[in-house]
């Protein structure tokens, strides 16, 4: 679906691929985080799915940029061979999404500063691509017409405490479908009780992290709310040669503030529009989310692995990497996941305690290594 017919020119897309995904231990780790895995057994990684969505919006890989950390550059090259080297933007160190987004915006080769930009996180899934494209098109139209930033929200199907929420009010100036709401508040990962309240109130949506707007609209928000970051990048912006820019970015990044786009921009911005959609969206942050969305066998087992044999086992989340053979007998409501460096066997209802358990494991590993911090548990 090329959107050039509806907004004048195809949008540019920034794919944010710099997160570490540490909650999906032991599969998602520092050396290979979750966006580089096929977590739902579809035959494509999360990054590849996101690139396909971006390509459907732009019509050409030349209008797509992927932003990731330097250490994962080879993974992106391997999984996206159609991405030109100059369109792979590498962060020397992690500085969160506000800096990464600004870096990406300045790297776009736009015809004008009014060109539309779509920012896509790469660790999400979308089940209904047609409805997703339609929702993006509506958001792009609103962004072009109003010169405002439009964020994408999804109608919640349950009180999910692991997601971000956006509260909204009617936007009387909007048409029947195009960005019909103004953004009122953001809340990140509320308590279960508060999530229940949000669902009952009826004026909250899940915040997808997808943002749509003209390039100049994004840059204006940075000039107003993050002027120090703009100043740090002034020399980078003045240089047009891609090779010189890549050498300069190593000097720039240590001076940048580490803050999310929501905290640095969205929480401060006055006028934000919400495009509310329903296209089977989810954020694969926890094993529980992967289990919920994964195809299951007759006994409720979600299995990712080519050589897994299950006997008398029900409602398990099984993720076995590579060609390893696994035989599981008599297990119910468990998570079993492996990687070359670790194995997780955990009741599904105890996944929320995993981070504390890992902290204990790290301390034990440190003690065994004579006080040296173990490198393989992050």
Regions found by a protein language model. Give the residues of each.
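Conserved N-terminal catalytic core of the sugar/cofactor nucleotidyltransferase
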Residues: 1-15, 23-33, 41-121, 125-137
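Residue-level signal for inorganic ion chemistry
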Residues: 47, 104, 123, 166, ...
